[in-house]
Amino acid sequence: MSSAKRSTSRVSKKKAAPAKDGAPKKREQSTRYKYVELNKASLTSAEAQHFYGVVIDATFPYKTNQERYICSLKVVDPSLYLKSQKGTGDASDYATLVLYAKRFEDLPIIHRIGDIIRVHRATLRLYNGQRQFNANVFYNSSWALFSTDKKSALQEIGGQEPASDLTPFAFSGKNYTFEKSEAALLQNIRKWAVQYFQQYNVISSDMFTPLNKAQAQKGDFDVVAKILQVFELDEYTNELKLKDQSGQVFYTLALKLKFPHLRAGEVVRIRSATYDETSTQKKVLLLSHYSNIVTFVSASKLAKEVKAKVTDDKSVEKAALKQDVSLSAVVLTEVDKKHAGLPTHSLQDLFHNADTDKEISSKDTFRTQFYITRVEPVDVKEWVKSYDRKTKKPSSHKGAGAKGGENIFQVQFLVKDASTQLNNNTYRVLLYTQDGLGANFFNVKPDNLYKNNDARKKLEEYNELLTKFNSYVDAVVERRNGFYFIKDTRIIF
């Protein structure tokens, strides 16, 4: 099974949307709910409250004791979103929503802020001057999540199409209700959410800590940063390279099963991180069991600003490559932007599961990460061949042969990754450029390396770099006749 499928399996099994037409299952007797605005819900009434809200922050569901799981969210709507509405400045205002359940799977997992939650039968109280809604899912409360963008975060990475814009992508219980009268309410709050994220930062400056001040923090703090790199540390864990507008670079570990939606280039909000005092080689953020990493809806003004202003100068990697032994993983390559959204597949997926996994067998282009144990031919001068397009045969430049042909690279990489770490196999990934695939991988034009000493020396340097400890390749590969060929990938060092 592919990593993309593994990551979404829990959500799809436990909270799968209904039949393809998106029609909810009908209860025997329809219940018409009266929805209230967050700031207009009565603090004195003992009656249960029903509401729609836009999520702007959330913990990951976590266990508090033997019988209780909890998830805490910040929600807004047109009645409650700016403190200036109370005459106290332009920072974001919100209500909190605390959901309780006896099972982890009965609570919502928020992957993206800006999406919409509908809650039935919550109670309301004032806690530290803030409106706090409490929903006991183990009693009679319920929730449903609706995407503000066309697709939910998991639908984006999984390639699924939503049933309809009135269908929740996740919900509590076995089914949900949806009255016709709710359609306009949902569409209106969705439209408002888009405008709200376009006009305001939403995550105002008082709601996160710049990374250059992280070391001074005594406890948990929140972060808004751009993911510069997603590195597969092992079969279960990704290491994220993060940078924010303060210019600081940090790293953090993110479990694949917990955070399957994260991609390089995206802007994220990290809820509840701490500074790692023990790390001396690089700056690290530690996450707790309740920490969350969420992306932003596409309309987000703040995300667009951070994405545009934060760039990767690769200074950390350049310094690491100068060391005899690099203690930090260095990804030597980048893939073409058109493949930025491709999920990463392991070598186990590509070489062992391709025939049995329907998702993999139906495609021919994949993204993968690996390290190189050996490059063949061992003699760098033989990396370039003369290719005769009439006979479709390559020949060596050695000696007096190879006249009139086209110079191409023919290189084989013997590779491994985290998923194949414990087996005795190595796997061949090919750089054969006669059809144009991978032509720019080396940033060196193929030439007769028996004569062109400058090109040969450059490629010898690349050979050393590619096989150096802790050096990795992030590549797009195309499957042809059972072989994987590198394409749309280039070395950036």
From Swiss-Prot:
Quaternary structure annotation from Swiss-Prot or TrEMBL: Heterodimer of an alpha and a beta subunit.
Remaining remarks: The sequence of STY56V is shown. STY56I differs in only one position.
GO process annotations (BP): regulation of telomere maintenance via telomerase; telomere capping
Source species, domain of life: Eukaryota
Name of the protein this chain belongs to: Telomere-binding protein subunit alpha
Taxonomic source organism: Stylonychia mytilus
Function: May function as protective capping of the single-stranded telomeric overhang. May also participate in telomere length regulation during DNA replication.
A Gene Ontology molecular function term of the record: telomerase inhibitor activity
Matching SUPFAM superfamilies: Nucleic acid-binding proteins (SSF50249)
Pfam families: POT1 (PF02765), TEBP_OB2-like (PF22236)
Record keywords: Chromosome, DNA-binding, Nucleus, Telomere
Biased composition (Basic residues): 7-17
Protein family: Belongs to the telombin family.
Residue numbers spanned by region Disordered: 1-30
One cellular component term from this protein's GO annotations in UniProt: nuclear telomere cap complex
Location within or outside the cell: Nucleus; Chromosome, Telomere
